[in-house]
Structures are given as C-alpha cells and as structure tokens.
Regions:
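Membrane-embedded transmembrane alpha-helical bundles that form the catalytic cores
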Residues: 1-406, 418-456
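Hydrophobic, aromatic-rich transmembrane alpha-helices
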Residues: 407-415
C-alpha cells in the first residue's frame, strides 16, 4: 500500500481518519490502541507473513525493557541489541556474507531466497535507540501499547524518519482534535501530504524515466555515452532527493493528520558548502542516529585525532552497509567517510574555503558518489564513470529541461515543511492545493507508479 496509491488515498486513509476522529471524540482512551491496530493493518497489507515478525519484535523488546527495569542488568539490553541486529542480518545480509564465504576454496555456504521485511532496518534502529537510552537512564518505562505505537506507527514504519522516543511519546497524551489550532494543523498536514505527492509524482518519477534505463543498460554491461551518463548521474542526484524527501513530507503530513509531529529529515541538502554540512541536511535523522549511537560509541572525537578518523570512517562505511547488502553501498559509505575525514583534517589545519568553492566541490562529490549508490554492480558503476568522461562516445538527446527544473527547486526553494507552515490561512490556498491534488491523481492514473527508493532499505 504505497502512500501514492489509490487504495491508500481513497480507502485506508479516509477510513483511518474517520475512525480516529470518532474515537478521539467519544472514546479517547481507545485512541492509541486504534492507532496501533491501524498501523499493523497498514503493515500487513504489504505482506501479512511479516506481521508476526513485527509483533514479536515489539513484544520481545518491550519485555526485555521491563526485565531490565526490574533487574537493572545491563547485559539484558546488550543481548537485546545483538539479537535485533542478528535478526536484521539474517534477513538482509545472510546471502551477502554467504557470497563472501563462498570465495574460500572448498566452502559452500548455503543461500536462502527470503524476502526482506519492509521497514526492518528502521524499526530495528528504533528498538536500539530506546533500549540504549533506557540503559543510560534517559528513557522512562512505557506500556506495551505506547511502545508498539512508537515502533509501528504507520507513517514512519516503512522508511522513517528515525524518531527518538523523546520526540513522540509526550505527544501521545494529547487529544489533538481538541487543540485550539487543530483545524490549522490538520490543513497543513493535508498540504504536506499533497506537496510530498507532487514532488514524488511530478519530479521524482519523471526523472526515474530518464535514469533507470541508463543504469539498467550499464549494469547489463552496455557502453554508456557521455550524454547518457551525465543525464543518469544528474538525474539520479535529484531523483533520490525528490523521491525520499517527497516520502518524508508525506509521512510528516500523515502524522500531523493524526495529531503527531515527526522530525524533519531534509534541509535543502544540495545547498551544502561542505560534506559535513551535507550530512547535517540530508537524511538528518539517520545522521543523528549514526552520530549518537555509533560514532560516539566508537570514541567520537574524545580520544585523539587518529581514533576520531577511524570512528568516522567506520561509521560511514557501516552506514553504507545499512542501506543495502552490497559492496557498492559499502564503498559509497566509505567514500563519504574518507571525504568527512578529509574535512576534519582540513579544519584541523586551520584552512578555509570560499562558500562557492565549497558548494561546487561538495555537489560534485555527492553527485559522483551517487553512482555507486544507484548502480547494482561495480561494473555498472564503472560504465557510468567511463561515460562521464567520454569513453563511450558523446551521444545526444540530453533531457536538460527536467533536470534543470529539478535542480532549481532543490537548490532555491525552501523545504516543503517550511513552505507549508509559512502559508497564511487563506481559502484560495486550500483551493490551489485541492487542484494540485486532483492533477496529481490524474498523473498517478496515467503513468507508472514507482515505489519509493528507500522502501528497499
């Protein structure tokens, strides 16, 4: 059930909103159980076989949290984190490591054809955040229903944002439709939903048509011309931004419809003037998780420059692996780790750089490394890189209009959250968004309905 599908927009969402409004008004004590039920129904629509996994994940981690609070045995939390990561590894990385093992002569590690449960990378990290903070004495005890909603809340369960317990739990005590600004918040939630849909459908999916065939050809071993390579590389640079930020806008808008404010995930990342600045603006909740729960745990910047660089490189390489079970993702993360390490050394040396130069270098670096992220093989990435430098011929037919329009919106415009929340309460604005929604629906009906890129992670 994609956020940009008719069954979600015209069946699940209206029923969910109506029942939520009725319960919030007449039986507020049922509100949280209802949201949990809706979240599991939403998750089960994708593949009901993984509902028991999500249920077990919630129940086991909650029971371990209760056991820790009763015994104060920190080893329980350590075991829980290891088990969570082990479950993630079995589903996501088993065949990846089996391929490595089979490189050893005489060893024949088995491989299994198992589907990846949607959202497992995200709800695993949610468990880790809560349990780690619980052990540190920062997180309080929560009941099973509240904890289940924190983990499985349907706008965030599939692809984030990664939400800290401290950002959402206190909101569950509110009666959102009784607030003085309830109507305004609901309206802005609808506008965010429409804005995210428009970004995904009009820009992200449009660019996918120019990007996917070229990367598929490269992965198949075909030569790529310079025009094709630049079109695919630039196109994917903006496709992934509008696809993922569009999803995030929709998730934030949907959550707002149910009275919950989720953290923002993007802050105009392609205006960054350094790689460090980029990771403060791109997938901000993941960057925050990697910093607080991995980089600092590895020593951070507290144990000297050498260990800081090792911790930074390791964090980014593992961050790349988190995105996918493939060496291309690891190398993508490692490349960003090396880039961030270079930035640390640059600043330690007391050097500076004009913002314009920093922006150009950062954009080029990010753009070139996206090739590794998008290509499914190193051979495919190499074909794209060869094409970028003209080894596959020049070519023709560069789709510059769509890419230029996407670049302008990505670099000049504000975030959808900032834009929507700055709009005055005017009837014509509501009408404009309603018209935009109708146009989006026609577009969805006419064209291919692409899944969100980050659903595969």
């Amino acid at each position: 059930m994609l956020f940009n599908s008719f069954i979600f927009l015209f069946a699940f969402l209206p029923v969910a909103l109506l029942t939520h409004w009725l319960v919030e008004r007449f039986r507020p004590e049922w509100r949280l159980p209802l949201l949990v039920l809706l979240s599991f129904v939403f998750y089960g629509y994708w593949d009901w076989r993984f509902v028991p996994l999500l249920l077990a994940s919630v129940l086991v981690n909650w029971l371990i949290a209760q056991a820790f609070l009763a015994s104060k045995c920190s080893g329980l939390v350590t075991v829980a984190i290891v088990v969570n990561l082990a479950v993630l590894a079995v589903f996501k990385y088993f065949n990846f490591f089996a391929d490595f093992a089979n490189l050893i002569p005489g060893l024949h590690a088995p491989k299994f054809d198992i589907a990846l449960p949607l959202g497992i990378s995200f709800f695993t990290f949610h468990h880790i955040m809560y349990l780690t903070d619980l052990r540190a004495g920062k997180a309080p005890r929560y009941g099973l229903v509240r904890y289940a909603l924190y983990i499985a809340f349907f706008p965030q369960v599939l692809a984030g944002p990664l939400v800290r317990w401290s950002e959402i739990m206190h909101q569950l005590d509110e009666r959102p439709y009784q607030r003085h600004d309830a109507a305004e918040r609901f309206a802005r939630g609808l506008m965010l939903l429409v804005a995210g849909l428009a970004k995904k459908v009009f820009i992200g999916d449009q660019l996918a048509e120019y990007v996917n065939p070229i990367f598929q050809a490269a992965d198949a071993g075909k030569a790529v011309t310079m025009i094709e390579a630049w079109q695919a590389t630039l196109g994917f640079t903006f496709q992934i931004y509008f696809d993922f930020s569009g999803y995030t806008d929709m998730a934030l808008g949907l959550a707002l419809l149910f009275g919950i404010v989720l953290p923002q995930n993007f802050d105009v990342p392609y205006r960054s003037v350094s790689l460090q600045d980029f990771w403060r603006r791109w997938h901000m909740t993941l960057s925050r998780f990697l910093r607080d729960y991995l980089y600092i745990a590895l020593g951070g910047n507290r144990r000297g420059l050498a260990l800081q660089l090792v911790a930074l490189f390791t964090t980014m390489a593992l961050g790349g692996l988190w995105h996918g079970a493939g060496l291309t993702f690891v190398v993508w993360g490692a490349a960003h780790g090396l880039g961030l390490c270079a930035g640390v050394l640059w600043r330690k040396a007391g050097l500076s750089m004009p913002n314009l130069v920093g922006w150009v270098l950062t954009f080029i670096f990010v753009m070139l490394t996206w090739v590794l992220f998008r290509a499914t093989t190193f051979e495919g990435a190499l074909r794209i890189y060869e094409g970028l430098f003209g080894f596959g011929g020049f070519g023709a037919g560069f789709k510059w209009r769509a890419i230029a329009a996407a670049a302008a919106v990505a670099m000049i415009g504000p975030t959808a959250w900032a834009f929507v929340h700055k709009l005055p309460a005017r009837r014509w604005i509501a009408v404009a968004f309603a018209v935009l929604f109708v146009i989006v629906l026609f577009k969805i009906g006419d064209d291919a309905n692409y899944e969100f890129i980050y659903f595969q992670f």
